[in-house]
Design a protein with these regions (language model features):
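Beta-strand signatures of extracellular beta-sandwich domains
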Residues: 55-59, 109-111
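Short beta-strand His + acidic residue motifs that chelate non-heme Fe in jelly-roll/DSBH
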Residues: 42, 97-100
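Short beta-strand elements of extracellular/lumenal beta-sandwich folds
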Residues: 35-45
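C-terminal interaction-tip segments
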Residues: 1-36, 92, 100-116
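A generic structural motif
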Residues: 49-51, 94, 105
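Intrinsically disordered, low-complexity Pro/Gly/Ser/Thr-rich segments with frequent PxxP/GP/PP motifs
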Residues: 60-96
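Short solvent-exposed strand-capping/beta-turn motif centered on an Asx-Ser/Thr pair
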Residues: 44-49, 102
Length: 116
């Protein structure tokens, strides 16, 4: 097993969510220098006057967003508030982070790190 020593902080995504699934981040594939990607912080800001829900998935290579790979599913974000999640998720090589909202008005920011 590789010993990962150097972790580089990265902003993985910042985007306005739409009502269709969008790929926010794709985990890099580097066969000569294996890396491990960590997702550490997710902030979802609701800029509207009403509650909005969102789905966020860690989707395997060649997969689709399904309930079986959901990290958040119909997660409510109250009007004019920010939902924050601070938990470490190790992302498989070539997987993607995909998300959508019930309506427009959510901005998502995802931060993490890449270890070599």
């Amino acid at each position: 097993m590789a010993n990962y020593q150097n972790v580089t902080p990265v902003q993985m995504a910042q985007a306005a969510l739409t009502t269709s699934y969008a790929t926010l981040y794709t985990v890099p594939t580097n066969p000569t220098t294996p890396t491990r990607t960590y997702m550490k912080q997710i902030d979802v800001c609701n800029t509207t006057g009403g509650a909005v829900t969102f789905n966020l998935h860690i989707v395997p290579l060649s997969g689709s967003p399904l309930t079986s790979n959901a990290l958040f599913y119909t997660q409510n974000v109250a009007a004019n508030t920010t939902f924050s999640y601070a938990g470490v998720q190790v992302l498989p090589t070539s997987s993607t982070i995909q998300a959508k909202a019930s309506t427009t008005g959510l901005t998502i920011t995802i931060s993490g790190g890449e270890a070599v």
